Regions:
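Short, solvent-exposed loop/turn segments at conserved positions within beta-propeller repeat blades
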Residues: 81-88, 133-138
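Single conserved hydrophobic/aromatic residue that forms the stacking wall/gate
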Residues: 1-11
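Residue position within the beta-strands of beta-propeller blades
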Residues: 29, 73, 126-127
């Protein structure tokens, strides 16, 4: 544990924060280049919870409103620039961040937002920017109706057009 790294993560590198709907002390913090961090004491201390995965770069984090033990994570930084790192799709944790599974959209490179339907956890939308400096990839707005097992593009067209916000 390095307090300086914690400070840098919180101030400089934060990409997104999701706060547990039933416990204000539990936060998940997605960072552009330091993975995902969890606090159970409103930010006094943090624990890295994504260090053993295939990418360190994240863009968004979302808690399932119907089941707060389910965490969705979009990988790849959600900001443009020459310094950004890309990710490899959407990840899901069913145990509050203890373990993760890649749920697809591996060619998206930059997922900037994930929304879970408030009444149906099987319906998820993911905004994909796609590769920043090349055409193609999985870019656009994607929807899953089976809990992230399969994704269908519902918005997006050209090989250079991605989605950053829902």
């Amino acid at each position: 544990y390095d307090r300086r790294r914690q400070r840098q993560m919180c101030i400089r590198d934060r990409a997104d924060i999701a706060i547990h709907p039933n416990n204000d002390n539990v936060w998940y913090v997605a960072t552009g280049s330091s993975g995902v961090w969890k606090t159970e004491n409103s930010g006094t201390t943090y624990t890295p919870i994504f260090d053993n995965e295939t990418t360190y770069s994240t863009g968004c984090v979302t808690i399932d409103p119907s089941d707060p033990s389910i965490i969705w994570l979009g990988t790849g930084e959600n900001v443009g620039g020459r310094h950004v790192a890309f990710g490899d799709g959407v990840f899901k944790s069913e145990n509050g961040g203890k373990s993760w599974k890649n749920m697809g959209l591996r060619k998206s490179e930059h997922i900037s937002e994930i929304i879970v339907h408030p009444n149906n956890s099987n319906i998820i939308w993911a905004a994909s920017q796609g590769p920043l400096w090349s055409p193609g990839g999985e870019r656009g707005l994607y929807k899953s109706i089976d809990g992230g097992e399969n994704w269908k593009k519902v918005l997006g067209g050209g090989k250079w057009t991605g989605v950053t916000d829902i």
